[in-house]
């Protein structure tokens, strides 16, 4: 049996096609027939949900008590500034968290390059616009950046009454994963006389903080680490009955009326063809704010209700909507 296992072909990373600064196609071949989809799907899921990275988690802006405050002389609303800060692509080396500062005065744009930081932090997109100042105005803020993994909503980092009542501390929903979009395809490959082999092509878009080759290496290490225990022949465990799970969490299949929202918020969502919770969680904060008659308070109401159910905005749902909803 061991001999047959060792006879399996081992893939090589044969090419990296750099499409632009943040997007690349990575090709691995040759693979045994069927292994293209097996590895492609596993790597895709890991790259999207489990890659470590750095993100902004907390902000303090002078003169601002909460995200609904108004900052005189700043073109954007505070909520929009926080959304812009989430767009910063940063790399953190040697530390688990850092506190940086930004002070800018005079009319014009405030960009990522205006942030004062040490050498352990690298800002990959220094031209990213944070806000615009109008007139002879000054803005000053402190920004907390942490290492993490996946998506962590702001509400999960509020652990005490002191955190809840802390005026001026603006907690930010953190997306730590540097991989923003990924798709894969499986093509035919050939080795000598064998023509029934697979070639795996992974199309990946990141925030620029992680090279494609390194991303594949890290994802493969995570996958291998999860499988290590199965390789040890000394481990013999009783079979575990695994309950078959539905394709989607039942909560996602429920109508938005089931959320504890005001009539106005629910009507705004339906006007944009958002009928199910699964439709809603795939929208981003920016998309919802662009909807007519849906303001910041309604957005906060929606986010809080989703977080209470273990959900958040900007989720990626494969194969949505399910056939059962389409048939209905």
From Swiss-Prot:
Catalytic activity reported: RNA(n) + a ribonucleoside 5'-triphosphate = RNA(n+1) + diphosphate
Top-level enzyme category: transferase
Protease recorded as keyword: no
Assigned GO CC terms: cytoplasm; DNA-directed RNA polymerase complex
Classification via CDD domains: RNAP_alpha_NTD (cd06928)
Keyword check for Acetylation: no
Region: Alpha C-terminal domain (alpha-CTD), residue numbers: 248-328
GO BP term, pick one: DNA-templated transcription
SUPFAM superfamilies reported for this sequence: C-terminal domain of RNA polymerase alpha subunit (SSF47789), Insert subdomain of RNA polymerase alpha subunit (SSF56553), RBP11-like subunits of RNA polymerase (SSF55257)
EC number, UniProt record: 2.7.7.6
Signal sequence extent: none
Residue ranges of coiled coil: none
GO molecular function: DNA binding; DNA-directed RNA polymerase activity; protein dimerization activity
Pfam family, one: RNA_pol_L
Annotated stretches, region: Alpha N-terminal domain (alpha-NTD): 1-234
Record keywords, A-Z: DNA-directed RNA polymerase, Nucleotidyltransferase, Transcription, Transferase
Protein family: Belongs to the RNA polymerase alpha chain family.
HAMAP family named among the record's database cross-references: RNApol_bact_RpoA
Domain description: The N-terminal domain is essential for RNAP assembly and basal transcription, whereas the C-terminal domain is involved in interaction with transcriptional regulators and with upstream promoter elements.
Subunit structure: Homodimer. The RNAP catalytic core consists of 2 alpha, 1 beta, 1 beta' and 1 omega subunit. When a sigma factor is associated with the core the holoenzyme is formed, which can initiate transcription.
Record's function text: DNA-dependent RNA polymerase catalyzes the transcription of DNA into RNA using the four ribonucleoside triphosphates as substrates.
Name recorded for this polypeptide: DNA-directed RNA polymerase subunit alpha 1
């Amino acid at each position: 049996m061991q001999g047959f296992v060792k006879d399996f072909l081992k893939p090589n990373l044969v090419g990296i096609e750099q499409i632009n600064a943040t997007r690349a196609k990575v090709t691995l071949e040759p693979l045994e027939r069927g292994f293209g989809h097996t590895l492609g799907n596993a790597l895709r899921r890991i790259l999207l949900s489990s890659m470590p990275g750095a993100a902004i988690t907390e902000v303090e802006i002078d003169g601002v008590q909460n995200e609904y405050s108004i900052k005189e002389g700043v073109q954007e609303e505070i909520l929009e500034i926080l959304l812009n800060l989430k767009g910063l692509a940063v790399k953190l080396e040697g530390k688990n968290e850092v506190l940086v500062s930004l002070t800018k005065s005079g009319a014009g744009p405030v960009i990522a390059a205006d942030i004062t930081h040490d050498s352990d932090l690298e800002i990959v997109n220094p031209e990213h616009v944070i806000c615009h100042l109008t007139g002879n105005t000054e803005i000053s803020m402190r920004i907390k950046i942490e290492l993490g993994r996946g998506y962590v909503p702001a509400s999960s980092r509020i652990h005490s009454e002191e955190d809840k009542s802390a005026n001026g501390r603006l907690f930010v929903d953190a997306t730590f994963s540097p991989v923003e979009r990924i798709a894969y395809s499986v093509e035919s490959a050939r080795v000598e006389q064998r023509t029934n082999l697979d070639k795996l092509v992974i199309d990946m878009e990141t925030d620029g903080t992680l090279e494609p080759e390194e991303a594949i290496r890290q994802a493969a290490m995570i996958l291998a680490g999860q499988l290590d225990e199965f390789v040890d022949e000394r481990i013999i465990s009783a079979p575990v009955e695994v309950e078959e799970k539905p394709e989607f969490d039942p909560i996602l299949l429920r109508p938005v009326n089931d959320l504890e929202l005001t009539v106005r918020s629910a009507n705004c969502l339906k006007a944009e063809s958002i009928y199910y919770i699964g439709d809603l969680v795939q929208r981003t904060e920016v998309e919802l704010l662009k909807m007519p008659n849906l303001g910041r308070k309604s957005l906060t109401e929606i986010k809080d209700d989703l977080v209470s159910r273990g959900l958040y905005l900007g989720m990626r749902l494969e194969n949505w909507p399910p056939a059962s909803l389409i048939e209905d």
